[in-house]
C-alpha cells in the first residue's frame, strides 16, 4: 500500500480506536476526545491536559451541537493540524514545527480552528479530499515529531521537505485532480447505489408484472392442450367411466400402440409427447368409445375387462395388423392413436383375447358388446364366408364364439341378437342359416344327395377342420347331423 494511503488508514484507525459506536453512529465523547488529544496531539497542542483546551476544541468541532465529535468533524481537527504544520514547514524547513504550531494554536486557537472548521467542512462535503489533507497532516506530524526528537531529526526534515516540494511543485492542481476524481467516483458510487436501489425497486415492482404474464402464458398453453383433450373426450356419452379405467393403464396402452405399428407411431409419438400421458389416456379412451358407440352400457364392461388383458393384446396386435390394418392405416393416419386403438380393439376380440372374460361372464356383457363390434368391423375385409362356417356352435362356446354370432348378425341383418337373447337367437339362427347355405351350395337334387353323402361320410368334416381348426370341425359335425335330418325330410317329401 502506498505511504499516503497508509497515512489515511492510520487516521481512520485512530478515530475508531478512541470513538464509541452506538447503533449506526460512531463518535467521540468529551472524555474520549480528551484522551485522543493527550495521546495523539500532545506534541502539537499547548496544554493538552488542560480541561479548558478540551472544551474549546469540542466547542469548535461540534457543528451540530450534539456534544460528540463525528468522523467528519474529527477530520476538521486533522486538517487544521496538517495546515499549521504545512505553513511552518513552508516558512522554515529547519524550524521546529511543534513549537511554532503550539504558539499559534495557543494564541489564536479559536480563530484558526474556526477557519479550519470551515475549510475542513468544505473539504468534507466535497468528498474524499479530506483524506488527502489528513494524510498531509499525518506526514507533517511525523516530520514534526522527527524534528523534536534528536535521533529522527534528519528523517523528519527529509519527509517534511518531500511534502513541501510535492505541494510546491504540483501546487493545487494535482491535489484537485486527485480530489475531483474521487469526488466524482464517490458521487458516481452514490448514484450507482441509488440507481441500483432504484433498479432493485423497479425490478421488484416489475417482477410481479412479469410473473402473471408468464403464468398466463403457461395457463394459455395448458388450456390449449386441455381443450384439445376435452374436445376428444366429448365424443360419447359414456366416456367418463371408460376413461377412468383406461387412465390407470396408460403405460400399457402406450406399449400396445408402439408394438402394433411402427410407421403409424411416428406421427403418434410426435403428437403424444406434447400431451404426455394424458393425451394417450384420452386417445385410449377414444378407441374404446368408438369401438362401443352402438352399445354404450355393454361397451363399458367390455373395456374394463379388456384393460386387464393388456399384455395379450399387444402380441395380438402384431399378428393381426398385417391383415386388416392396411385399410385402417390409410384412414387412421389422420386420427393418430385413435384409429390404431380402435383397430386394436377389434383385433383383440378377433384373436380371442376375451376368451377368459367370456368364460367368466358368459353371455352377459362381453358377448353383447363383442358381437356387435366385430360384426360391424369384420365385414369390411370381406371374410363373411369364414364366419358363416363357424356360425353353428352354441353361444356359450363361441366367442371365438362372438365371431360366430357376428357373422350371423352381419349377413342376415339381425343385429338385435347380441343385445337381447344370444343363446336362444343363435339356436334360431341355425334354423335360418342352413337354408341360406343350402341356397348357395345346392344346385339340384343330385348335388343335394352328393353333399349329404359327403356329410355322412365325414369328408367335408375333414376339409373344414384343416382350415378352421377343432372348433370349426365340431361345428361341421353338427352341420352333418343337421343335413341328415334335412335329407330324411327331403326323402320323405319326394314323389
From Swiss-Prot:
Record's protein name: Cornulin
Residue numbers binding Ca(2+): 62, 64, 66, 68, 73
Entries under InterPro entries matching the protein: EF-hand-dom_pair, EF_Hand_1_Ca_BS, EF_hand_dom, S-100_dom, S100_Ca-bd_sub
Bias type Polar residues, positions: 99-110, 152-194, 243-282, 290-303, 334-355, 403-420, 460-473
Phylogenetic classification of the source organism: Eukaryota, Metazoa, Chordata, Craniata, Vertebrata
Source organism of this protein record: Homo sapiens (Human)
Induction pattern: Up-regulated after heat shock, ponasterone A and deoxycholic acid. Induced in response to pro-inflammatory cytokines.
Tissue: Expressed in the basal skin layer (at protein level). Squamous epithelia cell-specific. Expressed in the esophagus (periphery of the cells of the granular and the upper spinous layers), foreskin (granular and lower cornified cells), scalp skin (granular layer), inner root sheath of the hair follicle and in primary keratinocytes (at protein level). Expressed in the squamous epithelium of the cervix, esophagus, foreskin and larynx. Expressed in the fetal bladder and scalp skin. Expressed at very low levels in the lung, kidney, uterus, skeletal muscle, heart and fetal brain.
GO BP: cell-cell adhesion; cellular response to cytokine stimulus; positive regulation of cell cycle G1/S phase transition; positive regulation of keratinocyte proliferation; positive regulation of NF-kappaB transcription factor activity; regulation of gene expression; regulation of phosphatidylinositol 3-kinase/protein kinase B signal transduction; response to heat
Amino acid at each position: 500500500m502506498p505511504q499516503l494511503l497508509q497515512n489515511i488508514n492510520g487516521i481512520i484507525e485512530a478515530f475508531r480506536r478512541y470513538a464509541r459506536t452506538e447503533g449506526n453512529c460512531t463518535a467521540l465523547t468529551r472524555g474520549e476526545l480528551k484522551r485522543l488529544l493527550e495521546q495523539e496531539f500532545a506534541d502539537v497542542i499547548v496544554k493538552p491536559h488542560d480541561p479548558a483546551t478540551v472544551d474549546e476544541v469540542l466547542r469548535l468541532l461540534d457543528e451540530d451541537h450534539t456534544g460528540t465529535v463525528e468522523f467528519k468533524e474529527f477530520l476538521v481537527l486533522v486538517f487544521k493540524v496538517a495546515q499549521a504544520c504545512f505553513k511552518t514547514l513552508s516558512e522554515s524547513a529547519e524550524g521546529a514545527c511543534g513549537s511554532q504550531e503550539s504558539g499559534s494554536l495557543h494564541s489564536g486557537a479559536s480563530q484558526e480552528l474556526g477557519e479550519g472548521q470551515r475549510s475542513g467542512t468544505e473539504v468534507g462535503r466535497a468528498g474524499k479530499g479530506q483524506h488527502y489533507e489528513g494524510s498531509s497532516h499525518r506526514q507533517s506530524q511525523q516530520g514534526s515529531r522527527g524534528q523534536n526528537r534528536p535521533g529522527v531529526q534528519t528523517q523528519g526534515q527529509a519527509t517534511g521537505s518531500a511534502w513541501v516540494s510535492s505541494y510546491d511543485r504540483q501546487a493545487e492542481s494535482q491535489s484537485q485532480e486527485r480530489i475531483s476524481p474521487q469526488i466524482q467516483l464517490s458521487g458516481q458510487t452514490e448514484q450507482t447505489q441509488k440507481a441500483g436501489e432504484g433498479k432493485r425497486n423497479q425490478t421488484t415492482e416489475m417482477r410481479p408484472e412479469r410473473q402473471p404474464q408468464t403464468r398466463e402464458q403457461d395457463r394459455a398453453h395448458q388450456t390449449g392442450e386441455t381443450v384439445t383433450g376435452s374436445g376428444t373426450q366429448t365424443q360419447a356419452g359414456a366416456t367418463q367411466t371408460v376413461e377412468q379405467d383406461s387412465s390407470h393403464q396408460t403405460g400399457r396402452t402406450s406399449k400396445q400402440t408402439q408394438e402394433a405399428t411402427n410407421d403409424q407411431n411416428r406421427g403418434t409419438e410426435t403428437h403424444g409427447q406434447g400431451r404426455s400421458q394424458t393425451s394417450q389416456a384420452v386417445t385410449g379412451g377414444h378407441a374404446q368409445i368408438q369401438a362401443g358407440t352402438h352399445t354404450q352400457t355393454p361397451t363399458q364392461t367390455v373395456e374394463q375387462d379388456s384393460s386387464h388383458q393388456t399384455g395379450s393384446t399387444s402380441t395380438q396386435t402384431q399378428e393381426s395388423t398385417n391383415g386388416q390394418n392396411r385399410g385402417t392405416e390409410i384412414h387412421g393416419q389422420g386420427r393418430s392413436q385413435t384409429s390404431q386403438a380402435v383397430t386394436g380393439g377389434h383385433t383383440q376380440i378377433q384373436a380371442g383375447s376375451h376368451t377368459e372374460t367370456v368364460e367368466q361372464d358368459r353371455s352377459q356383457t362381453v358377448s353383447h358388446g363383442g358381437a356387435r363390434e366385430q360384426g360391424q368391423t369384420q365385414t369390411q375385409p370381406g371374410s363373411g364366408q369364414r364366419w358363416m362356417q363357424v356360425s353353428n356352435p352354441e353361444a356359450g362356446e363361441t366367442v371365438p364364439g362372438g365371431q360366430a354370432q357376428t357373422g350371423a348378425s352381419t349377413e342376415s341383418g339381425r343385429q338385435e341378437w347380441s343385445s337381447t337373447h344370444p343363446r336362444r337367437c343363435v339356436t334360431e339362427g341355425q334354423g335360418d342359416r342352413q337354408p341360406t347355405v343350402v341356397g348357395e351350395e345346392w344346385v339340384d337334387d343330385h348335388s343335394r344327395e352328393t353333399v349329404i353323402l359327403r356329410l355322412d361320410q365325414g369328408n367335408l368334416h375333414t376339409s373344414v377342420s384343416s382350415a378352421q381348426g377343432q372348433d370349426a370341425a365340431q361345428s361341421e359335425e353338427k352341420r352333418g347331423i343337421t343335413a341328415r335330418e334335412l335329407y330324411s325330410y327331403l326323402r320323405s317329401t319326394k314323389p
